[in-house]
Amino acid sequence: MARNRLTESEMNEALRALDGWQKVDGREAITRSFKFKDFSTAFGFMAQAALYAEKLDHHPEWFNAYNRVDVTLATHSENGVTELDIKMARKMNAIAG
């Protein structure tokens, strides 16, 4: 999977197809807040996403409070968003349903 930083237009195009994701202000990253019915469901989402992140060797920044999971994705080695981040975002959306 390519780790080349996406151009602004590539990132904008990818975000149009990613429900709920947006650019982070003041940083080259994307973010989304997921809300679930309860803590167990939120934690289950994180467990599934973590297993996928390990396969991809690309790990999210995230924060969990009860039924909410806030996620930020960026490829630190490229100082920006790459196809790996887009792939991870797609998978997280699929897991969340």
From Swiss-Prot:
It comes from the Bacteria. GO terms for molecular function: 4-alpha-hydroxytetrahydrobiopterin dehydratase activity. It is an enzyme of class 4 (lyase). Pfam families: Pterin_4a (PF01329). Keywords: Lyase. Belongs to the pterin-4-alpha-carbinolamine dehydratase family. This is Putative pterin-4-alpha-carbinolamine dehydratase. It comes from Brucella melitensis biotype 1 (strain ATCC 23456 / CCUG 17765 / NCTC 10094 / 16M).
